């Protein structure tokens, strides 16, 4: 069944998907609309760090927006990101809106510091959301045991909680 990208849950995110909002830097990062432009990556894990590092090949600057005050990524990945001259971490911050739906393209993000409440706008041409995945297991709820995140619980030999279902 696979998994789907976790979304920010913003109306502007949905409206601007494929118009500057994307979930895959390696798929879309080299597109002309992103070249030599400021870009935003949302997230703080290994995937977000990989996306940010990849995008430094194309973007003028990459803002790494993370809701915490340090990365959750592995130490080696975090060190690479924090040393890179084209990556600017934006700590303790969440995206509250992606701009600009009226122009039908991404022109920036409105962000809010979760500690101070201060808001500001970061100008950018693209938003790369890298905040994890959600398993596509909705159809199995109530039929097969799922963990707290919605993943199928496996027993020995890849068996599930239902005999004969692997």
Residue ranges and their predicted role:
Residues 43-45:
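Glycine-rich Rossmann-fold phosphate-binding loop(s) that bind the pyrophosphate
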Residues 22, 40, 63-65, 90, ...:
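Hydrophobic/aromatic beta-strand patches that form the interior of the parallel beta-sheet core
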Residues 56-156:
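A Rossmann-like FAD-binding core segment of flavoenzymes
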Residues 48-49:
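N-terminal Rossmann-fold NAD(P) dinucleotide-binding loop
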Residues 18, 35-38, 58-60, 85, ...:
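Short coil/turn connectors at secondary-structure junctions
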Residues 4, 9, 14-33, 131-166:
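FAD-site-proximal beta/loop scaffold in flavoenzymes
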